[in-house]
């Protein structure tokens, strides 16, 4: 079955009593197990059935089946946020004394979690600047390797195939944050990655109306992640959010095609504009990761970053004069968004680490929406003319 068909039909069950095509919203915190023996068996994991919505909900379960199919995974888990996803993964897979490696930069919230919270559990955090640096220098004590396929916000390409090669040298578990590409453009598990995760808030949801996280992988790994996420940390997604995320995923291919088309046109325009110092978009032949990404993914994503001369003040002038682009963090919405990462999404990083990661004061990140590309270009042209 092709991806577009799976995005609509996978995990969807026509209700046998009513014939309803849409998954109902089961707004129930607890579920009856009807007799004591059935309750005993459900709590022991010996019989199927729902107990309590923190552990699972019928609306959520159908969404998880759809996401597992789209990822090519044994199973998927949806949780309250992308940060809930990454924290559950890390706590499930690493123990005190282990080492966790990552390829930077990461999303600022993930970076802060690893360095300020997770490290307090007695876990060593080691950063690498590229997949090749990881391959050459990975340490034997490494238990988990975390990376983003396109780094946020510098859009550096990290090759999952190289990460897998490096991790297998020391027996480490690989975790790929594929938020920027989605399973429509890349299915990391097919390249040997162990666990894939997303901020479901972004492209998967696609409408800017939910907060969600997604994790997918093998039964063996997901059993531990599910236990930590739902039973120990207690970060389930609500049924309303699950309902909306399932609806959003159905249109993922259509929306991603529009994001990609617009991002390429916007990047081409910006690359030719004299006021722009640098354009960062993997779809440009000038991007150092252009060929690599083209070899393992089926598209270059909907994110474009630029650098201007003049630091925060000049970036603010551009941002404040945009009319269609909305100044806001997050990404993957229908609307085009723009932000200054150094002062927003990555402000929690210490300055030295932030600058070393390429998140400088000249950088602006655009999430290109699904509006008409000509209108977006006109908006950018008018704002750039005021610099």
Predicted regions mapped to residue ranges:
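Short, well-ordered beta-strand elements within core beta-sheets of diverse protein domains
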Residues: 244-254, 302-309, 365-369
């Amino acid at each position: 079955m092709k991806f577009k068909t799976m995005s609509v039909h996978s995990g969807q069950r026509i209700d046998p009593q009513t014939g309803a095509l849409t998954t109902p919203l089961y707004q129930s915190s607890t579920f009856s197990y009807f007799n004591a023996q059935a309750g005993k068996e459900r709590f022991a994991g010996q019989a199927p059935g729902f107990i309590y919505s923190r552990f699972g909900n019928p609306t959520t379960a159908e969404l998880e089946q759809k996401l597992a199919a789209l990822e090519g995974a044994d199973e998927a888990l949806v949780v309250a946020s992308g940060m809930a996803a990454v924290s559950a993964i890390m706590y499930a897979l690493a123990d005190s004394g282990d080492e966790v490696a990552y390829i930077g930069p990461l999303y600022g919230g993930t970076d802060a979690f690893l360095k300020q919270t997770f490290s307090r559990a007695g876990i060593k955090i080691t950063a690498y600047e590229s997949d090749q640096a990881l391959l050459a220098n990975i340490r034997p004590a490494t238990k988990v390797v975390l990376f983003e396929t396109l780094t946020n916000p510098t859009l550096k390409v990290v090759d999952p195939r190289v990460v897998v090669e490096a991790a297998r040298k020391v027996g480490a578990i690989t975790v790929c944050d594929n938020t920027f590409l989605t399973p429509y453009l890349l299915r990391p598990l097919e390249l040997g990655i162990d666990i894939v995760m997303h901020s479901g808030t972004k492209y998967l949801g696609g409408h800017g109306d939910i907060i969600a996280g997604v994790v997918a992988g093998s039964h063996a790994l997901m059993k531990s992640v599910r236990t930590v996420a739902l039973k120990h940390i207690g970060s389930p997604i609500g049924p309303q959010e699950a309902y909306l995320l399932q609806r959003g995923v159905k249109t993922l291919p259509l929306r991603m095609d529009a994001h990609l088309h617009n991002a390429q046109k916007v990047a081409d325009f910006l690359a030719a504009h004299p006021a722009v110092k640098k354009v960062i978009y993997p779809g440009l032949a000038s991007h150092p990761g252009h060929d690599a990404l083209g070899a393992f993914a089926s598209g270059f994503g909907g994110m474009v970053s630029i650098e201007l001369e003049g630091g925060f003040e000049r970036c603010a002038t551009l941002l404040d004069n945009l009319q269609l682009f909305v100044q806001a963090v997050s990404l993957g919405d229908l609307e085009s968004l723009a932000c200054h990462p150094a002062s927003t999404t990555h402000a929690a990083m210490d300055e030295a680490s932030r600058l070393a990661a390429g998140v400088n004061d000249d950088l602006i990140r655009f999430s290109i929406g699904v509006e008409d590309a000509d209108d977006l270009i006109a908006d950018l042209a008018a704002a750039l003319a005021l610099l």
